[in-house]
């Protein structure tokens, strides 16, 4: 494999990095490529894509809260990112994950009241249902808004990490919300188990919406996310009772039968069950 092929492979590995493990991936890639300058240049575009798709968060310069770095907050003409809460733009370093050079931004006066109301309700929703979650609300135009939520849980001592991401596009003209929710979990104690799910709900909005309607919108979102969390829980239980059982030999290497009625008591099941709901869904 020549240098160009190694860099292409490295870029692909970046996009597949599990939650919270990208620094470990980059460290391993440095050993494989053995050329830091070439590696940094070769993976730059993949890092930018990964960070925006994974809703990487950064503390806003001069403030204590975090904002989501994503395509919804990208200012195309400058390449800077927007924190709509403080009306601040900043430069984001995709390698060091730091923000710098803050500047004030003039936002659209027509869309700001509704956006601000959605943000207030989103932050309350986070406080009620997520542990250390981050939310950002962007106005694409006076009739279209994007709510983004991300929550991470990293537990390297017990060999697992997880991330919840959700995005809801609110279209006032169409009277609908289209959503995407992603769950990524990586368990790697003496093995490599990954869970990846995608949920794409679409639902209608109440009529006659005003900024005061924001709590109703977040209540609908909370209901849908709660349904999704319960469906994941049911699917996980089914995996333990049926799918995993069919994959195992009748007698393992220990020559002892595995009690499948107690599968949730084994270590993998115990770890995942103990941390179900760690993202704080309803």
Regions found by a protein language model. Give the residues of each.
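Surface-exposed short loop/turn segments
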Residues: 116, 120, 124, 128, ...
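Generic hydrophobic, helix-prone segments enriched in Leu/Val/Ile
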Residues: 14, 43-51, 57, 118, ...
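Alpha-helical protein-protein interaction scaffolds
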Residues: 1-77
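Charge-rich, solvent-exposed alpha-helical interaction surfaces
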Residues: 9-13, 25-28, 42, 46, ...
